[in-house]
């Protein structure tokens, strides 16, 4: 499992990103720059999803992967920040391994699916299977960002479709399907 780490602080901060078309490999500088506000107070870690993913992987399995990585690096009592699919993973991390979690911050995520999420994720899977990357990137942007943001960057969608095209299409589809496995609601305190 690839990961990025930066920061000079003593406290560990685990960032768990959302569903992405690409891995974090080669993105250390840009990630460290985007999250530089945490670098003074925290030792920041951003874990990628593992390379080889089965078609039946769940967000709970992804949480287990992060727990194993944290165990390997001897990270405990960390502040956890999960965004979107990363928030789903973070919830299972807190449920299954509370010893690893000091504080949990969740953003734009859910603890159980609804019809909108199921329809959206299934659309992304179908679009990806059709190899229509411009449509995938445009649809993801329209669903994830504000109208103002999308309008501002609309001229760049063709370029983003090339830059953000999944390098490993089956991996992306498996990770998208994993979003549909989130059922943490009844296990949360």
Regions found by a protein language model. Give the residues of each.
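Structural signature of beta-strand start/N-cap positions in the alpha/beta core
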Residues: 12, 43, 77-79, 100-103
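Alpha-helical elements of Rossmann-like donor-binding domains used by nucleotide-donor carbohydrate transfer enzymes
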Residues: 33, 61-68, 123, 139, ...
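Conserved alpha/beta-hydrolase catalytic His-Asp/Glu region
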Residues: 115-118, 133-187
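Active-site loop/oxyanion-hole signature of alpha/beta-hydrolase fold enzymes
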Residues: 31-81
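Gly/Ala-rich beta-loop-alpha elbow adjacent to hydrolase catalytic centers
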Residues: 82-86, 90
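Conserved HGGG/HGGXW glycine-rich cap/lid loop of the alpha/beta-hydrolase fold
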Residues: 1-53
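Flexible "cap/lid" loop of the alpha/beta hydrolase fold
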Residues: 91, 95, 101-132, 171
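Short glycine-/acidic-enriched loop or helix-start segments at secondary-structure transitions
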Residues: 24-26, 56, 90-91, 115-116
């Amino acid at each position: 499992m690839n990961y990025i780490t930066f920061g000079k602080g003593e406290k560990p901060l685990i960032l768990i990103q959302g569903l992405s078309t690409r891995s974090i490999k080669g993105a250390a500088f840009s990630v460290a720059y985007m999250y530089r506000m945490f670098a003074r107070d925290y030792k920041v870690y951003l874990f990628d999803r593992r390379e080889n993913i089965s078609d039946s992987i769940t967000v709970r399995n992804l949480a287990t992967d992060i727990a194993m990585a944290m165990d390997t690096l001897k990270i405990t009592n960390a502040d956890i920040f999960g965004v979107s699919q990363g928030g789903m993973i973070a919830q299972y991390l807190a449920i299954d391994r509370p010893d690893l979690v000091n504080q949990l911050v969740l953003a734009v995520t859910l603890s159980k699916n609804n019809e909108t999420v199921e329809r959206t994720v299934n659309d992304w899977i179908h679009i990806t299977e059709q190899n229509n990357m411009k449509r995938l990137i445009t649809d993801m942007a329209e669903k994830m960002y504000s109208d103002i943001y999308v309008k501002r960057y609309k001229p760049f969608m063709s370029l983003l479709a090339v830059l953000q095209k999944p390098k490993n299409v089956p991996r992306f589809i498996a990770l998208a399907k994993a979003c549909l496995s989130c059922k943490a609601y009844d296990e949360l305190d």
